[in-house]
């Protein structure tokens, strides 16, 4: 499935999310978020979800007319397209799943995150929140040339 099939549901999700965030924001405050980042994270999560959780994720993201394989292929196409840079342009995208130490996700989930979402997987100790946050922030800084 072409990444272009993600445009309408991702735009609808982005505007709904903005509307929700804006309703809760303090007056005069700016809202800064990455709709693509959030929809990608939830889509990666959906690869490992089943049952009601999967249905809720797909409904929220507007993917109800598609199956998981189609969504995975569309994101794979999107990240392949984003990976092509021109000499005077650069766009860095980084996806990752931070897994709680001691928890082992299913191998298929790990493979799908890597294959379809160009995602990295690393373990974090969630009992040490500051260290976990630092690891995640370091990953982001490295991916964004910060």
Region locations from a protein language model:
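Active-site-surrounding "flap" and adjacent substrate/cofactor-binding loops of secreted or lumenal enzymes
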Residues: 45-81
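Surface-exposed loop/turn and secondary-structure junction residues enriched for glycine/proline
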Residues: 34-39, 45-47, 60, 64-66, ...
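Flexible propeptides and autoinhibitory/regulatory segments associated with cysteine proteases
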Residues: 1-56, 142-146
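Non-catalytic, conformational "gating/processing" segments within enzyme and secreted inhibitor domains
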Residues: 28, 68-146
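Short alpha-helical "patches" and their helix-cap loops
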Residues: 30-35, 52-65, 108-118
